From Swiss-Prot:
It is an enzyme of class 4 (lyase). The gene is fumC. Its main location: cytoplasm. Belongs to the class-II fumarase/aspartase family. Fumarase subfamily. GO terms for molecular function: fumarate hydratase activity. It holds the Pfam family Lyase_1. SUPFAM superfamilies: L-aspartase-like. This is Fumarate hydratase class II. Pathway: Carbohydrate metabolism; tricarboxylic acid cycle; (S)-malate from fumarate: step 1/1. The record marks 328 as: Important for catalytic activity.
Length: 463
């Protein structure tokens, strides 16, 4: 163990760790739970420190030597392998101050170590005076939240969503000539194609992509420069423009200064809105996964209109059983995301006066939702959707037996006569044709002329 100091006194920390006194205190006082601060947030914080050092150096608020030491230490952390030095849990101060200081301490000590100094000496690099210069946890942490959210959405969620949507598009084309019976209220309706059904799924996800893309607009606004309460106290002239410039270079994202720092520190409406778009996506995915599970139910005593890929045995007692496991896993992920949405919404209400104090749990839930959805959508696309096959025999049988084909006769016979045909066929176990002819409404030839499932698919499908 080695001795570290902060404003409250001495704290003993492990000799081989780069963090300091404030991280040590947080480890002691918030030791419960297993939920570590997400690495995406740590990386975002490190990027902010790197860019702030460059900005402070440009403004001659930080000497070139210390600037270069901080930048080099930041780059070393970003290259990976030092995750053990960031041990803090999500459950800490609601401003994220302790994780901000964790990053400050590790950067300072790493810079000191690389130049032959003594860990914990704060010389020549001080975690507050140099690494945290021109910053406050209150503007740094929400900035890190937005950076982590944007990069996770664009880096993993959107590509995974596009991948699934393209797989559904491919199936819509593959199944474009497979006529089936539509269902409303879980009951038989008029004919459509399986491809039309899949095109609906694809479009639903395309709309989700648009919503998520729109939510990025507000996430591009960064709180950096607001410092403690939004007034920008202790921020040198020109710092905000320079740090934003360097962050844009570092991340490749079009970040801009927040339009109002008081709002940027005290609320997280942008993240609440963005997570809301994830909850909408979860709703859409549950609908799609549920539909596909039902369409393939059976295979002999259910709907059985599609065949699932045979990925693994489905039962420990029933041999030969194949279950829609990818569908079920996706629905569990979506359930978690919808639960996270409630947490994010409530946490978003806790912007008491000038500072929201639920920041860590907001970004933890947000990133968990993004990571779970990204993985689950890729798995669902690759191991389920891409392997779906149509059971054409079952589709044809269902179409031939459907009573709702009588809808094609409504313009010819009227609603009331068509109702009599359908009810007679149902109660007497007749075909629609048999019921129609026995009632004397049409001849067999006339019936066949008007009731053609392939002509009931909508103008675009007929063309």
């Amino acid at each position: 163990m080695r001795q570290e100091n902060d404003s409250l006194g001495i704290v003993m920390v492990p000799e081989d760790k780069l963090f300091g006194a404030q991280t040590g205190r947080s480890k002691n006082f918030f030791s419960y739970g297993k939920e570590l601060m997400p690495i995406e947030v740590i990386q975002a914080l490190v990027k902010i420190k790197k860019c702030a050092a460059k900005a402070n150096g440009d403004l001659q608020c930080l000497d070139a030597k210390r600037r270069d030491m901080i930048v080099a230490a930041s780059d070393e952390i970003l290259s990976g392998g030092l995750e053990e030095h960031f041990p803090l849990k999500v459950w800490q101060t609601g401003s994220g101050t302790q994780s901000n200081m964790n990053v400050n301490e590790v950067i300072a000590n790493l810079a000191i170590k690389r130049h032959g100094g003594e860990l914990g000496s704060k010389n020549p690099v001080h975690p507050n005076d140099h690494v945290n210069k021109s910053q406050s946890s209150n503007d740094v942490f929400p900035t890190a939240m937005h950076i982590a959210a944007v990069q996770s959405i664009k880096g993993s969620l959107i590509p995974a969503l596009e991948h699934l949507q393209k797989n559904l598009d491919a199936k819509a084309l593959e199944f474009s000539r497979d006529i089936k019976i539509g269902r409303t209220h879980l009951m038989d309706a008029v004919p459509m194609t399986l491809g039309q059904e899949f095109s609906g799924y694809s479009h639903q996800l395309r709309s989700c992509l648009e919503r998520i893309g729109f939510s990025l607009t507000h996430l591009y606004e960064l709180a950096i420069g607001g410092t403690a309460v939004g007034t920008g106290l202790n921020v040198p002239e020109g710092f905000v423009d320079k740090v934003i410039y360097y962050l844009r270079q570092e991340t490749g994202e079009p970040f801009i200064p927040a339009s109002n720092y008081f709002a940027a520190l005290s609320n997280h409406d942008a993240l609440v809105q963005a997570h809301g778009s994830l909850a909408v996506l979860a709703c859409s995915l549950i609908k799609i996964a549920t539909d596909l599970s039902f369409l393939g139910s059976g295979p002999r005593c259910g709907l059985g209109e599609i065949f699932f890929p045979e990925n693994e045995p489905g039962s420990s007692i029933m041999p030969g059983k194949i279950n829609p496991t990818q569908s079920e896993a996706l629905q569990m992920v979506c359930s978690q995301v919808i639960g996270n949405n409630q947490s994010v919404i409530f946490s978003g209400t806790k912007g008491n006066f000038e500072l929201n104090v639920m920041k860590p749990v907001i970004i933890y839930d947000f990133l968990q939702s993004v990571n779970l959805l990204s993985g689950a959508m890729r798995s669902f696309a690759d191991y389920f959707v891409s392997g779906l096959k149509v059971n054409r025999g079952q589709l044809q049988q269902n179409v031939e037996r459907s009573l709702m084909l009588v809808t094609a006769l409504a313009p010819v016979l009227g609603y009331d006569k068509c109702s009599k045909i359908a009810l007679k066929a149902f109660h007497e176990n007749l075909s629609l044709k048999e019921a129609c002819v026995s009632l004397g409404f049409l001849s067999e030839q006339e019936f066949d002329t008007h009731v053609v499932p392939g002509l009931m698919l909508g103008k675009r499908e007929r063309e």
